[in-house]
Structure formats: C-alpha cells, structure tokens
Regions:
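Small-residue (G/A/S/T)-rich helix-start motifs and N-terminal tracts that mark the onset
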Residues: 1-76
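Alpha-helical scaffolding segments of alpha/beta enzyme cores, especially the outer helices
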Residues: 63, 67, 86-93, 97
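N-terminal glycine-rich "phosphate-gripper" loop used for MgATP/nucleotide binding
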Residues: 75-88
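Generic enzyme active-site microenvironment
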Residues: 76, 104-105
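Short, well-ordered, mixed-charge alpha-helical segments that flank or form enzyme active sites
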Residues: 86, 111-114
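A short helix->loop->beta-strand "cap" motif at the edges of active sites that frequently abuts
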Residues: 98-103
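Single conserved hydrophobic/aromatic residue that forms the stacking wall/gate
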Residues: 115-123
Length: 123
C-alpha cells in the first residue's frame, strides 16, 4: 500500500475556510498528501475582513507539534500565520529538535491583519 506523504501545516484557523489551516489542508489533500495541522491562532474572519484573532498558548502549540512529529513524522512543514513571538520561539525550538527535511515559510504575521474591523478594536 502506498503511503501518502505527511505534510504538517502550522498556521492560524480561518473559520470561513478561505485561508490558514483550512486552505492548507485542502491544498495538501488535493496534491495527494496527508495533512496534519497545528493551530497557532483562531481567527474570526470572512470575505469581508478579519474581526478578531486569539493566539493559542505556546505550550499547546508545542504539544501539538510534538504529538504530530513523534507519531506521523512529516516529510515537510509549512508555516503560515504566527501571531505571537513566544509561539515563534516555540516553533523554532521544535524545528531544532526534530530537524524536518523540508520547511516552507509563508509568513502571515498579525501586523498584516491591521485592518481588523473598527467595532472589534473598540471592544
């Protein structure tokens, strides 16, 4: 039986499905890979904009990475939205520990989400 290559996506979650982990899973699957995921942040967004961003605790991010790396052993890691410097440090620590064969860095930082809607910024 042929094993599909495991690709790990480390990124934010987009509830509308148009970006982040959801888009990565669709793309990896369409290309014949097996998608594993690590959520770095949860966003409230749609086609009209980003309304809120909540980072995941760094220890949860570390736990997710370790769970996937220890079991599934991905051949590649794709890194997208990283919303917090502590999460960046956590990811770097894990990359040093596991030394994946391929890393794709597709940076989406919170600063690029500066157009968070006015009502959300006031609350």
């Amino acid at each position: 039986m042929e094993r599909h290559p495991v690709i790990l996506s480390i990124a934010g979650s987009d509830c509308s499905g148009g970006a982040g982990i959801q888009a990565d899973i669709k793309t990896i699957s369409a290309l014949g890979g097996y998608a594993a995921s690590v959520i770095t942040a949860v966003t409230v967004q749609n086609t009209l904009g980003v309304h809120a961003v909540q980072s995941v605790l760094p220890e949860i991010v570390r736990g997710q990475i370790e769970a996937v790396m220890d079991d599934l052993r991905p051949v590649a890691i794709k890194i997208g939205m990283v919303s917090d410097i502590q999460i960046v440090r956590t990811i770097v620590d894990c990359l040093r520990k596991y030394i994946p064969e391929y890393i794709v860095y597709d940076p989406v930082m919170v600063l690029s989400l500066i157009h968070i809607s006015e009502p959300t910024r006031r609350s």
